[in-house]
């Protein structure tokens, strides 16, 4: 008897568009590419103390309603222009939520917030929203949680984050080493710095690992390393101020 030993706990499977399909469906224009390229470089200059402005990522905990996000972006873009000489503002546009146990995992995973998990719809909504925000002249930052989803949106992301719950993950450190944008790594949920410091050192280096391409092929990827990795102090058992 040949026993079933493969995918025995997978109960459903639905195909989603390959990254290149959504990228081609919702391409970025020259102005958006200029915005993303320029703000990535500006963030890098600030991180390396070659620009004395303050870099601030501001916005909601996570995106659940694209229309509300656009209204927020419209207001933030006004402030961005007002304070641009002293502050580089990036809008926090988080589509994925890491959970300590279970709960809603974000717009990409469950865009209708009703446990229907229409990931194809979520990916499309995420890309469309990022383009609309960029058209306002506002750079966007996001947390990278799933190792495949970056292929759908990273060309519109000026800054990225690795969360406290994934800072020690080898997969996410490898991912950070290959991202085209500056990447912040949070300190651990206990407030300790070691996970973030180790994560930065790992992200600085080249890595070789399995990953997905824009064509949705599985490939060996080799990264150059990310010298714009830095710590995000999230606090722990007490606030950072204390």
Residue ranges and their predicted role:
Residues 16-32, 75-80, 194-205, 233, ...:
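Short charge-dense sequence patches
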Residues 63-83, 116-128:
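Glycine-rich anion/phosphate-binding loops
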Residues 35-53, 68-82:
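Generic N-terminal targeting/processing segments that precede catalytic cores or assembly contacts
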Residues 2-7, 86-242:
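Active-site-facing alpha/beta catalytic cores
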Residues 62-63, 238:
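Short strand->helix junction
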Residues 6-50:
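N- or domain-start disorder-to-order transition segments that initiate the globular core
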Residues 59:
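Conserved, mostly hydrophobic/aromatic
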């Amino acid at each position: 008897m040949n026993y079933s030993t493969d995918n025995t706990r997978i109960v459903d499977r639905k195909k989603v568009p390959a990254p290149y399909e959504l990228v081609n469906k919702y391409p970025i224009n020259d102005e958006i590419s200029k915005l993303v390229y320029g703000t990535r470089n500006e963030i890098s200059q600030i991180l390396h103390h070659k620009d004395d402005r303050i870099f601030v990522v501001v916005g909601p905990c996570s995106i659940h309603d694209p229309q509300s996000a656009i209204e927020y972006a419209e207001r933030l873009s006004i402030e961005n222009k007002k304070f641009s000489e002293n502050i580089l503002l990036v809008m926090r546009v988080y589509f994925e939520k890491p959970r300590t146990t279970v709960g809603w995992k974000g717009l990409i995973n469950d865009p209708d917030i009703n446990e229907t998990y229409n990931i194809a719809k979520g990916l499309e909504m995420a890309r469309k929203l990022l383009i609309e925000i960029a058209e306002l002249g506002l750079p966007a930052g996001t947390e990278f949680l799933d190792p495949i989803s970056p292929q759908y949106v990273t060309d519109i992301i000026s800054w990225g984050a690795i969360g406290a719950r994934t800072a020690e993950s080898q997969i996410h450190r490898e991912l950070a080493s290959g991202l085209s944008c500056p990447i912040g790594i949070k300190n651990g949920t206990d407030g300790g710095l070691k996970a973030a410091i180790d994560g930065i050192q790992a992200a600085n280096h080249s890595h070789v690992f399995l990953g997905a391409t824009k064509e949705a092929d599985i490939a060996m990827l080799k990264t150059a390393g990310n010298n714009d990795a830095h710590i995000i102090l999230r606090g722990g058992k007490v606030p950072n101020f204390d």
